[in-house]
Amino acid sequence: VKCGDLPLAKIIENTVTTEAVASFVDQLMDIDGSPSDDYEELTQVPVGVIDVGGKTTDCAVLLPGMMVDSSRSGSNDVGVLMLVEAVSAKLRAHLDLDTALPTSAIERALRTGSVKIYGKEQSVKEIVDEEKERLADQIMSAVRTKVGSGVDLDHVLFVGGGAIVLRDQLLKHYPHARVPDQPEFANARG
């Protein structure tokens, strides 16, 4: 690669992998680039990383020495934006509305479990919780086809914006899983 006559970089190898790997790297470093408190542990044991994004869920299994197990890593076309669509449809039917609620109202329902209809608060927590469970099950079914049961993994990390929205539902699937701080920025930081 050159800029004019000056070489900028000599690319020796290029590897394409899932965003989940970048999220793993994020867990290895502090904000200043120094090794995190978890660095030694995470680099010496098998770790699963599940990045629940808007449209896709990426997963990666990293083996000791930070080697990616490509047979257990990949991407699935199921993401947290499906929750907005599902809740919107359920609320429209449940509330007998002619048109769908605005996206902002659906997002509020996901956060608070309630919507305002004709100026009055209505609880929709049961519908939201049912749809969260359904989507988390769908996501985890897809993840298990790659990652497996997770019994052989020392850690499982849930990252991405979906890890915030579906935190409680996702953590039920792997007893040793955790959601790191600010999981929505994990792959960008990594």
Which residue stretches match the model-derived regions?
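Nucleotide/phosphate-binding catalytic cleft detector across ATP-hydrolyzing
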Residues: V1-V47, M66-V80, L101-V156, A163-G190
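Short, glycine/acidic-enriched loop or turn micro-motifs at the edges of active sites
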Residues: A22, G54-K55
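Gly/Ser/Thr-rich beta-alpha loop segments that engage phosphate groups in nucleotides
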Residues: K55-T56, G162-A163
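Short beta-strand scaffold segments in enzyme catalytic cores
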Residues: T57-V61
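Long, charge-rich alpha-helical interaction segments
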Residues: E85-D96
